[in-house]
Each structure stands twice: as C-alpha cells, then as structure tokens.
C-alpha cells in the first residue's frame, strides 16, 4: 500500500489525512411479497410476529474503492400465515483513503453500513406501507456488535479448521 504525501509549505511532507467518501448509493435488489392479499390487509386482534435479518458484505472495486452491501429481510407472520416478506440489498460505493490497514475491516463493516442504514430503513418502510401495511420502521442496528460477533465466529471457524488439519 502506498502512502500519499503532501507538502506543508516548509519542504517537509505529511501523510494524507484519512477520508471516507460515498461515491454512489443504489438499490441492488428489492422484493416485496404479500401472498395473502387482500385478506392479509384486514384488521387483526394481535400484532404479527416480525423476524428481521441483517447482513453486510464488502468487496474491493479498486485500490481505495469498496462496494458495501447492506441486506435487510423482514417477514411478518400471523401464526403460521405469512403476511408479508420484504428483502432489500442496498449498496454503496465508498472511497476509503489514509486509514491504517487494521482499521479497514471495522470501517467497511461498521461505519459504511451505519451510513447506508437510514436510507435502507426508509426503503423498507415505504415498501411495507405501499404493500398496504403500516410502515415497518426497523430499530437502529448495532453494527459494531454485529462485527464483533462475526469476528468471533470466524475465529472459532479458524480454530476448528486448525484442529481438523492437525488431526489428519
């Protein structure tokens, strides 16, 4: 990795200050299913159970450019009957420069999805409202906790793989 430098006017050089820029945001995939309509739109005695899943993926595009995709899916059920299913993959192209290598994964898996989340949340709310239901306002997500859990799971997988390799 190269370090960009700039002159500060007295002949000495200084490192480029860290920067994170959003180059683009986009809907990669959006699906809304309302299989029981119009019966599913009738008033209910109780609130439906809602199951929400969240995932984050990041892939390099160029030296400092990354594609980060926040995937949200939500299913609402009344007993065993599905009321709706919404799935969204919302992406952003980020330019990341001047950060130490050890900060890159947390930046891509915590900060980038944190910037994308309000937009993805609004798209899901609009889709459920347009489907005839009250808007689904997803609670804020702790991306730092998700990242820590992901790293712990990868560490366990690596340990299991090492154990299996030494056993053979």
From Swiss-Prot:
Keyword Chaperone annotated: yes
Molecular function per GO: unfolded protein binding
SUPFAM superfamilies xref list: SecB-like (SSF54611)
InterPro entries: SecB, SecB-like_sf
Single GO cellular component term: cytoplasm
Predominant localisation class: cytoplasm
Subcellular localization(s) per the UniProt record: Cytoplasm
This protein's UniProt keywords: Chaperone, Cytoplasm, Protein transport, Translocation, Transport
One Pfam entry name: SecB
Biological-process GO terms, alphabetical: protein folding; protein tetramerization; protein transport
Quaternary data: Homotetramer, a dimer of dimers. One homotetramer interacts with 1 SecA dimer.
Similarity comment: Belongs to the SecB family.
Function: One of the proteins required for the normal export of preproteins out of the cell cytoplasm. It is a molecular chaperone that binds to a subset of precursor proteins, maintaining them in a translocation-competent state. It also specifically binds to its receptor SecA.
Protein name: Protein-export protein SecB
């Amino acid at each position: 990795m190269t370090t960009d430098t700039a002159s500060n006017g007295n002949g000495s050089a200084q490192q480029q200050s860290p920067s994170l820029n959003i180059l683009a945001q986009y809907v990669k995939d959006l699906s809304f299913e309302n299989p029981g309509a119009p019966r599913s739109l009738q008033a209910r005695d109780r609130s439906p159970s809602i199951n929400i899943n969240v995932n984050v993926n990041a892939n390099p595009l160029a030296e400092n450019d990354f594609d980060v995709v926040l995937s949200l899916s939500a299913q609402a059920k009344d007993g065993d009957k599905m009321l709706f299913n919404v799935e969204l993959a919302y992406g952003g192209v980020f330019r990341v420069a001047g950060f130490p290598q050890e900060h890159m994964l947390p930046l891509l898996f915590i900060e980038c999805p944190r910037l994308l989340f309000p937009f993805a949340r609004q798209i899901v709310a609009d889709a459920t409202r347009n489907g005839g239901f009250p808007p689904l306002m997803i609670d804020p997500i702790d991306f730092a906790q998700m990242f820590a859990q992901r790293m712990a799971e990868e560490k366990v997988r690596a340990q299991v793989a090492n154990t299996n390799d030494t056993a053979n």
